[in-house]
Amino acid sequence: MAAEDTPQDIADRERIFKRFDTNGDGKISSSELGDALKTLGSVTPDEVRRMMAEIDTDGDGFISFDEFTDFARANRGLVKDVSKIF
């Protein structure tokens, strides 16, 4: 059984998503993802493409908040680390 989201989990996800979604259109593009990941360290275009392919489950070329939430729930430790930076 999956762990329940705490109010802090939800707030962290919303804050990180808004930080990554720099143009505020409600979705994260590959360039926005790449820019955000660069603040975390060196990232190659191939790594960005792989992450987009993993997170963008509907294949529309953008990460929606729902897709981001699914990824965050599956990678809670990673998201907690990222939330400390953002």
Curated annotation (Swiss-Prot):
Stretches that traverse the bilayer: none
Pfam families for this protein: EF-hand_7
Keywords in alphabetical order: Allergen, Calcium, Metal-binding, Repeat
UniProt-listed PROSITE patterns: EF_HAND_1 (PS00018), EF_HAND_2 (PS50222)
Binding site for Ca(2+) 1: 21, 23, 25, 27, 32
GO molecular function list: calcium ion binding
Domain spans labelled EF-hand: 8-43, 43-78
Amino acids binding Ca(2+) 2: 56, 58, 60, 67
InterPro entries: EF-hand-dom_pair, EF_Hand_1_Ca_BS, EF_hand_dom, EF_hand_pair_protein_CML-like
Top-level taxon: Eukaryota
Name this protein carries in UniProt: Polcalcin Che a 3
Organism: Chenopodium album
